[in-house]
Amino acid sequence: MRYLFAGGGTGGHIYPAVAIAKEILKNEQDAQILFVGTEKGLEKELVPREGFELVTIEVQGFKRKLSFDTLKTVYKAFTGFKQANKILKDFKPHVVIGTGGYVCGPVLMAAVIKRIPTLIHEQNAFPGLTNRLLSPFVDIVAVSFEDSVKYFKKAKKVVVTGNPIREELLRVKKEEGREKLGFSMSKPLVVSVGGSRGAEKINSTMVELLKIKDRKFQVLIITGSSNYDKVLEKVKKENVVLDDSVKIVPYSHEMQYVYAAADIMICRAGAITLSEITAVGVPSILIPSPYVANNHQEYNARLLERQGAFHVILEKDLDAKKLYEKIEYLLSEPSLLNEMREKAKSMSRTDASYKIYQLVKTIT
């Protein structure tokens, strides 16, 4: 069978598609899989790296305010729709699966018009605009949270599946992760990561935190590729001493080692990040991004904070002193860390990819 995936922009839309595609290949070795994305999204790099073919179309998101860019967006939407139609005609997929991002719009609507079976997956507790608009037309809407079902009242069918995660994340032990990353087992490891695009406020706060003397834990800062040079410049400008207990890297393509090695994660609250840290069971301090549509990251974070697995600090309240005190408090309470770890794991759904594969088989 031929499977077409549409999704992109950030890792949060790409990695679920990759996880589902790998699940398909596990069950159907002869399956043909094609991804559709854009030239500017992270899919341009990540999809080929995962071993899948990617074709691109022209599309961009609508701005909140009317402007010349709005006209450009409308023009690109028509262009993208024509390009999507050609891809469907050439590839002849048996099913089209959308995992979010602007690219889903033209591809999924073209598939609906051609009466090709369709499924979309929503990662966030509060759904994105593209998926909300597509939901009345597609065959199945798969959601990650029970809380999301109420937003898809006009959908034909809504199923709670959880978020698909990559199987390799669950296979690494702490010792293996520490060795791979070059950290000692003798001290705790705190990891900060701002998502696939990075997070300037988290990065700058972590650099400030490195100035605090008598720090008893190791630090890994994953800056995001676009922020790496800026972070190194700040380190140099402010004469921050980096010893063997600190590493700063732009990005990691092997998050399985990072999650396994970490005692505490400091991260955004994107849906895929949350799915991964719950599956692995990493106690985390969540800093929801205030720059996302409908403030969905805080919505995600508060939903899980209420379960006792994570602590939340809003970006407007974030500073090095507050973050350091929170880290020190958690590290001084091993029983609390263990409790957070267990509560996180209890909320995870590690079979989401298989559930979605089973749903796909019901419409093909």
UniProtKB/Swiss-Prot annotation:
Entry's Gene Ontology cellular component terms: plasma membrane
InterPro entries reported in the protein's UniProt record: GlcNAc_MurG, Glyco_trans_28_C, GlycoTrans_28_N
Chain sites annotated for binding UDP-N-acetyl-alpha-D-glucosamine: 10-12, 124, 166, 196, 297
Enzyme's top EC category: transferase
Keyword Cell membrane among UniProt keywords: yes
Superkingdom of this protein's organism: Bacteria
Reaction catalysis annotation: di-trans,octa-cis-undecaprenyl diphospho-N-acetyl-alpha-D-muramoyl-L-alanyl-D-glutamyl-meso-2,6-diaminopimeloyl-D-alanyl-D-alanine + UDP-N-acetyl-alpha-D-glucosamine = di-trans,octa-cis-undecaprenyl diphospho-[N-acetyl-alpha-D-glucosaminyl-(1->4)]-N-acetyl-alpha-D-muramoyl-L-alanyl-D-glutamyl-meso-2,6-diaminopimeloyl-D-alanyl-D-alanine + UDP + H(+)
Known EC number: 2.4.1.227
Keyword entries, A-Z: Cell cycle, Cell division, Cell membrane, Cell shape, Cell wall biogenesis/degradation, Glycosyltransferase, Membrane, Peptidoglycan synthesis, Transferase
GO biological process, one term: carbohydrate metabolic process
One GO MF term: UDP-N-acetyl-D-glucosamine:N-acetylmuramoyl-L-alanyl-D-glutamyl-meso-2,6-diaminopimelyl-D-alanyl-D-alanine-diphosphoundecaprenol 4-beta-N-acetylglucosaminlytransferase activity
Subcellular location(s) of the protein: Cell membrane
Any matching Pfam family: Glyco_tran_28_C
Pathway annotation from the record: Cell wall biogenesis; peptidoglycan biosynthesis
Function noted in UniProt: Cell wall formation. Catalyzes the transfer of a GlcNAc subunit on undecaprenyl-pyrophosphoryl-MurNAc-pentapeptide (lipid intermediate I) to form undecaprenyl-pyrophosphoryl-MurNAc-(pentapeptide)GlcNAc (lipid intermediate II).
Family: Belongs to the glycosyltransferase 28 family. MurG subfamily.
PANTHER family in UniProt: GLYCOSYLTRANSFERASE, UDP-N-ACETYLGLUCOSAMINE--N-ACETYLMURAMYL-(PENTAPEPTIDE) PYROPHOSPHORYL-UNDECAPRENOL N-ACETYLGLUCOSAMINE TRANSFERASE 1
Name of the protein: UDP-N-acetylglucosamine--N-acetylmuramyl-(pentapeptide) pyrophosphoryl-undecaprenol N-acetylglucosamine transferase
The species this protein was found in: Caldanaerobacter subterraneus subsp. tengcongensis (strain DSM 15242 / JCM 11007 / NBRC 100824 / MB4)
Biological classification of the source: Bacteria, Bacillati, Bacillota, Clostridia, Thermoanaerobacterales
